[in-house]
Amino acid sequence: MTTSLANFIASLTAGALVLSAIGIALIIISKNDRVQRS
């Protein structure tokens, strides 16, 4: 595996981790935030 390919895969993995972390946080917040919307 070349260095550039390793860096590319690492950046993809990091991006996926960040996106999943944000998504999980939003889901938790939306579940806990029981604001009455008219």
Swiss-Prot record:
Record localization: Plastid, Chloroplast thylakoid membrane
Protein name: Photosystem II reaction center protein X
InterPro entries (alphabetical): PSII_PsbX, PSII_PsbX_type_1_subfam
Source lineage: Eukaryota, Sar, Stramenopiles, Ochrophyta, Bacillariophyta
GO biological process, one term: photosynthesis
Keywords: Chloroplast, Membrane, Photosynthesis, Photosystem II, Plastid, Thylakoid, Transmembrane, Transmembrane helix
Stretches that traverse the bilayer: 9-29
Principal location class: plastid
Top-level taxon of the source organism: Eukaryota
Subunit organization: PSII is composed of 1 copy each of membrane proteins PsbA, PsbB, PsbC, PsbD, PsbE, PsbF, PsbH, PsbI, PsbJ, PsbK, PsbL, PsbM, PsbT, PsbX, PsbY, PsbZ, Psb30/Ycf12, at least 3 peripheral proteins of the oxygen-evolving complex and a large number of cofactors. It forms dimeric complexes.
Pfam families: PsbX
Role, per record: Involved in the binding and/or turnover of quinones at the Q(B) site of photosystem II (PSII). PSII is a light-driven water plastoquinone oxidoreductase, using light energy to abstract electrons from H(2)O, generating a proton gradient subsequently used for ATP formation.
Membrane topology, as annotated: Single-pass membrane protein
